[in-house]
């Protein structure tokens, strides 16, 4: 992510960065920020859609910002709308499977897979900081995108920015 350094002050500009609301944010500038100019759809296999973007995780108290270049893959047959449509068709054919089964299916596999392609760590003033990004931290911050979990919010926001519709509203 060379050349992608960003400062705490820049992240607070809503025309370039969107703050991703989180229950763990203190309200003092910490949290996840989506670089709005970086969101783009990329080539994906049939039945999938893919989006790349850059997100920043701000931790002002630690004088640290982590920049992450991420890619999310969306299985179109796992969207909530698609699963509901399949379930409704099964009901019409006499199947008695309860609707809660859809929730369980989504919790088992949300249909969204995320990967981190690159990353960098910076001080709050935007200068590069020599620090690795650990897998445990990624799991705590953004991955995996589990249905019903807060980490599901970011890939859905990216999808809506790229395609104009929420992933789970896709038929």
Question: What would you call each of these model-derived segments?
Answer:
Residues 3-68, 73-171:
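N-terminal secretory-pathway/extracellular module detecting exported/lumenal segments
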């Amino acid at each position: 992510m060379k050349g992608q350094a960003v400062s705490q002050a820049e992240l607070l500009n809503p025309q370039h960065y969107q703050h991703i609301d989180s229950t763990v944010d203190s309200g003092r500038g910490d949290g996840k920020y989506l670089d709005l100019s970086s969101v783009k759809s990329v080539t994906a296999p049939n039945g999938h859609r893919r989006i790349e973007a850059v997100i920043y995780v701000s931790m002002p108290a630690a004088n640290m910002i982590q920049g992450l270049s991420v890619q999310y893959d969306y299985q179109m047959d796992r969207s909530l709308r698609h699963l509901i449509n399949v379930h409704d068709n099964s009901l019409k054919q006499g199947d008695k499977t309860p609707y809660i089964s859809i929730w369980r299916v989504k919790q088992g596999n949300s249909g969204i897979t995320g990967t981190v392609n690159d990353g960098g760590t910076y001080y709050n003033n935007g200068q590069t900081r020599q620090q690795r990004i650990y897998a445990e931290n990624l799991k705590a911050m953004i991955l995996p995108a589990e249905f019903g979990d807060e980490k599901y919010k970011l890939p859905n926001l990216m999808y809506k920015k790229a395609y104009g519709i929420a992933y789970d509203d896709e038929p």
